[in-house]
């Protein structure tokens, strides 16, 4: 993606985020944007909207169907995108909006990877440790199970990592022996 396109995506996303903040509907917009992203990720819609073989009217029709479950602000936002013929950028714009709203809310996904499933008490304890160590006011717990880490856990949030896995400890030990 070139710089001009990236700047365009950021400008569109910034405008909706500002409206959401101004009207105090950040969570509502975040939920709606997440639902739209889900639609894009479970369908071929991104390919259709970026295809040159599909007419502008057909693209407009697809975007109109997305608007049926959206708030007025998001409907207006989608209409502006269609009017400016930026349908091909809709998915990256939505992803950018989602990232910006996560920053605004401070609701970073806290990914915890373990070798086996955790009990609710263990999840809560690791979640609290992650929030404290990574200086996050709040977040969403996302659990992953990866037997290859052997034991321990890996916490990943806001581009920060706490790796207390047995695999990592063995790797560090191996490096010391060299």
UniProtKB/Swiss-Prot annotation:
Gene3D superfamilies listed in its UniProt record: N-terminal domain of the delta subunit of the F1F0-ATP synthase (1.10.520.20)
Keyword terms: ATP synthesis, Cell membrane, CF(1), Hydrogen ion transport, Ion transport, Membrane, Transport
SUPFAM superfamilies: N-terminal domain of the delta subunit of the F1F0-ATP synthase
Localisation per UniProt entry: Cell membrane
Membrane topology, as annotated: Peripheral membrane protein
Pfam families the UniProt entry points to: OSCP
Alphabetical list of InterPro entries matching this protein: ATP_synth_OSCP/delta_N_sf (IPR026015), ATPase_OSCP/dsu (IPR000711)
Presence of the UniProt keyword Cell division in the record: no
GO cellular component: plasma membrane; proton-transporting ATP synthase complex
Domain of life: Bacteria
Function: F(1)F(0) ATP synthase produces ATP from ADP in the presence of a proton or sodium gradient. F-type ATPases consist of two structural domains, F(1) containing the extramembraneous catalytic core and F(0) containing the membrane proton channel, linked together by a central stalk and a peripheral stalk. During catalysis, ATP synthesis in the catalytic domain of F(1) is coupled via a rotary mechanism of the central stalk subunits to proton translocation.
Family note: Belongs to the ATPase delta chain family.
An example molecular function term from Gene Ontology annotations: proton-transporting ATP synthase activity, rotational mechanism
Name of the protein this chain belongs to: ATP synthase subunit delta
Subunit field text: F-type ATPases have 2 components, F(1) - the catalytic core - and F(0) - the membrane proton channel. F(1) has five subunits: alpha(3), beta(3), gamma(1), delta(1), epsilon(1). F(0) has three main subunits: a(1), b(2) and c(10-14). The alpha and beta chains form an alternating ring which encloses part of the gamma chain. F(1) is attached to F(0) by a central stalk formed by the gamma and epsilon chains, while a peripheral stalk is formed by the delta and b chains.
Annotated gene: atpH
